[in-house]
Amino acid sequence: MSQMQIKSILLPTDFSENANHAIKYATSLARQFSASIICLHVIEPILPSVGYTGLTEPLPMPDLSEQLEDSAAEELPKVVGCKAFSNLVVEEIIAHGDASTEIVRVAKDRGVDLIVIASHGRTGLGRILFGSTAESVVRHASCPVLVVKPEQANES
């Protein structure tokens, strides 16, 4: 069996604390294999809520979409600019669509060798209501996927 070669790693981020912990795994592997990293943030479609009374005046959808785009464009360089990424080749991508679908698409289009993704560790009703992006990526990706669970993140 030939030695495993990892030249490119896809690191999806939603800017959460869990996603930040996956950085340790991705950057460590990138250093070990002299691999590049693609740091990806996916902006999911906004579905207007019906009957939500938390806002006195709802934001118009184009304004909210623009805010999400601006926020991602501001946050992604901050993530990639952290010390963990020093001396690594890193590309930033912002995509639009369903998170798991876009992660799998970018991985395939870019020919990445490994996806390192954080799991939020939801179970029960939370998982039913919100789904599992990591689980969907594992099921549909054509390359290996390393899932960093919240417990693993806290141990490292």
Predicted region positions:
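Structural beta-alpha unit
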Residues: 1-4, 32, 80-115, 152-156
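Short beta->alpha linker loops
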Residues: 71, 94-98, 120
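General small-molecule cofactor/ligand-binding pocket signal
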Residues: 40, 91-95, 146
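Aromatic/hydrophobic pocket-lining residues that form π-stacking "cages" and hydrophobic walls in ligand
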Residues: 26, 79, 103, 137
